[in-house]
């Protein structure tokens, strides 16, 4: 829906979606709002939050706090990904692959916001299946969390980085 960008300290915050939801009770409907946000330092740390409240600002604030609490570290390679990765969450599937310098972020909607705040500058990506923003964000973060640097893989296998890279 709307993309509000704010910087607090070294963290970048992006609002991905605000949604009005209702609960039907005997006396009518109770309206509330949900907010989906992502937070990142632009250098490999990223997290998302989902907040719900009776007012929009309160929902956004809750979502931002949850995003700051749920941050993960992503091993980036000079502003792009280490290797092609796939992520899945419920009906959403995302595929991302590294891109050469100058390509930019080729991604749509919710995925673009996650990649921007994570500090990815060049990437090719595609979302398949459900494009529900919550599921796409979760799938994107799943893919980024599953990405491993050559140094990590080499250490786990007990080999040198040159042996891993061929």
UniProtKB/Swiss-Prot annotation:
SUPFAM superfamilies: dsRNA-binding domain-like, Ribosomal protein S5 domain 2-like. GO terms for molecular function: rRNA binding; structural constituent of ribosome. The keyword rRNA-binding applies. It holds the Pfam family Ribosomal_S5_C. One of its GO terms (biological process) is translation. InterPro entries: Ribosomal_Su5_D2-typ_SF, Ribosomal_uS5, Ribosomal_uS5_bac-type, Ribosomal_uS5_C, Ribosomal_uS5_N, Ribosomal_uS5_N_CS, Ribsml_uS5_D2-typ_fold_subgr. Keywords: Ribonucleoprotein, Ribosomal protein, RNA-binding, rRNA-binding. Residues 11-74 form the S5 DRBM domain. GO terms for cellular component: small ribosomal subunit. HAMAP family: Ribosomal_uS5_B (MF_01307_B). With S4 and S12 plays an important role in translational accuracy. Part of the 30S ribosomal subunit. Contacts proteins S4 and S8. This is Small ribosomal subunit protein uS5. It comes from Actinobacillus succinogenes (strain ATCC 55618 / DSM 22257 / CCUG 43843 / 130Z).
């Amino acid at each position: 829906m709307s993309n509000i960008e704010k910087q607090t300290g070294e963290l970048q915050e992006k609002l991905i979606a605000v949604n009005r939801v209702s609960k039907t009770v005997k006396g009518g409907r109770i309206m509330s709002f949900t907010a989906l946000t992502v937070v990142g330092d632009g250098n490999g740390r990223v997290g998302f939050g989902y907040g719900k409240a009776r007012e929009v600002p309160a929902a956004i604030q809750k979502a931002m706090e949850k995003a700051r609490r749920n941050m993960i570290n992503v091993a980036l390679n000079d502003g792009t990904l280490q290797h092609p990765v796939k992520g899945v969450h419920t009906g959403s599937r995302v595929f991302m692959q590294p891109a050469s310098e100058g390509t930019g972020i080729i991604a749509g909607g919710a995925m673009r916001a996650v990649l921007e705040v994570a500090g990815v500058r060049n990437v090719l990506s595609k979302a398949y299946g459900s494009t529900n923003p919550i599921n796409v964000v979760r799938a994107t973060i799943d893919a980024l969390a599953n990405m491993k640097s050559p140094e990590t893989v080499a250490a786990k296998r007990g080999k040198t980085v040159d042996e891993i890279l061929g």
